[in-house]
Curated annotation (Swiss-Prot):
Catalytic activities: a lipid A disaccharide + ATP = a lipid IVA + ADP + H(+)
Annotated TM spans: none
Described function: Transfers the gamma-phosphate of ATP to the 4'-position of a tetraacyldisaccharide 1-phosphate intermediate (termed DS-1-P) to form tetraacyldisaccharide 1,4'-bis-phosphate (lipid IVA).
Alphabetized InterPro entries for the sequence: LpxK (IPR003758), P-loop_NTPase (IPR027417)
Single GO MF descriptor: ATP binding
Residues binding ATP: T68, V69, G70, G71, T72, G73, K74, T75
Family: Belongs to the LpxK family.
The keyword Metal-binding is assigned to this record: no
EC number: 2.7.1.130
Keywords: ATP-binding, Kinase, Lipid A biosynthesis, Lipid biosynthesis, Lipid metabolism, Nucleotide-binding, Transferase
GN (gene name): lpxK
GO CC annotation terms, alphabetical: plasma membrane
Alphabetical GO biological process terms: lipid A biosynthetic process; lipopolysaccharide core region biosynthetic process
Protein name: Tetraacyldisaccharide 4'-kinase
Length: 342
């Protein structure tokens, strides 16, 4: 893993910037993007035409994913959706790939699991929702194992996996942030895994800057709101973000879109110094030792990777809550129940 602010982090930042414009590098990579797009289209067509059959795991599946590379807010969306489904009378479970974990077979994730064995997002989901969570690169195998262990589960939420067509699904939700589709090019010339025109049941857009929604059908605003920060060593100790306004604060994030976390803090009235860490940063040691600050604000996703050996009293964790549009929840619930929304 690259050091904070090292070559990997700088490369990630440069690629992300290039994907927002149609510059010389993007145009130079378009032949490769055409090949990527052809391969992706053939794979989609194989399932759409019935040449390959998706696997029905016996209960409805809601996929929360994206058509772009990088973080868009899927994890808080999954957490909010699990809570909404539970409130609607369902018993949800969650499957995920377990990115970053050494997982080859279906594995249960509990609040006591380690991020290295479960993946940071699945562990966060397990701790926040208390729902059954299983991980495996083969999401079908994960879903089948989850159902065998929890026969009461009547709906499965797939954290990412939009392109995992082998898993049959009932509802597809695609999440975007303010960058939307970037320059509109497929990988590697742009950030798109699939064309923006890809069919989905609904689109969620989190734009903390303008709040504007693109003119796409079935599109809903996704609001991500920070809660009171809690102390890493003493989770019961909480402080409103406003209390950090007059302190020397560093905000650090090892997520797919760290600037979104920083923008959330600025919107709360803070003006922190910022440090973008590589996505899924492992925190093998403390990268903040030399920082002369009073408080360090980190994301929940990063916090699950910090074990009991961490003893930096400056670390505070900022939880983020996703607010789902009631109309979106109604759409999902009605589709799961096999009825058309009113």
């Amino acid at each position: 893993m690259s050091a904070p602010g090292g070559p990997l982090a700088r490369l990630e930042a440069r690629v992300t910037r290039e994907w927002q414009r149609r510059g010389a590098l993007a145009w130079a990579l378009t032949p490769f993007a055409c090949v990527f797009g052809l391969c992706a289209a053939l794979r989609r067509t194989a399932y759409a035409q019935g040449w390959k059959q998706p696997v029905d795991v016996g209960v409805p599946v809601v996929v929360v994913g994206n058509v772009t590379v990088g973080g868009t807010g899927k994890t808080p969306t999954v957490i909010a959706l699990v809570d909404a489904l539970r409130a609607a009378g369902f018993t949800p479970g969650v499957v995920s790939r377990g990115y970053g974990a050494n997982v080859k077979t279906p594995t249960a994730v509990t609040p006591a699991s380690r991020a290295s064995a479960a993946g940071d997002e699945p562990l966060l989901i397990a701790r926040r929702t208390d729902a059954p969570v299983w991980v495996c690169p083969d999401r079908v195998a994960a879903a089948q194992a989850l159902r065998a262990a929890h026969p009461d589960v009547d709906v499965i939420v797939s954290d990412d996996g939009l392109q995992h067509y082998r898993l049959a699904r009932t509802v597809e939700l695609v999440v975007f942030d303010h960058r939307l589709g970037g320059n509109g090019f497929l990988l590697p010339a742009g950030p798109l895994r699939e064309p923006l025109s890809r069919h989905r049941d609904a689109t969620l857009v989190n734009d903390p800057y303008s709040g504007a929604l693109p003119p796409w059908p079935d599109t809903y605003a996704l609001a991500l709101t920070p809660g009171a920060a809690w102390h890493l060593d003493q989770p019961a100790l909480r402080r409103p973000l406003s209390q950090f306004a007059h302190e020397r604060v560093l905000a650090a994030a090892g997520i797919g879109a760290p600037e979104r976390f920083f923008a959330t803090l600025r919107a709360a009235g803070l003006a922190p110094a910022t440090r973008a860490l590589p996505d899924h940063y492992a925190f093998a040691d403390n990268p903040f030792v030399d920082d002369a600050v009073d408080a360090i604000l980190i994301t929940e996703k990063d916090a699950v990777k910090l074990g009991a050996s961490w003893r930096d009293a400056r670390l505070w964790v900022v939880p983020v809550e996703a607010a789902l549009d009631p109309r979106l929840i109604a759409l999902v619930v009605e589709k799961l129940r096999g009825r058309s929304p009113a």
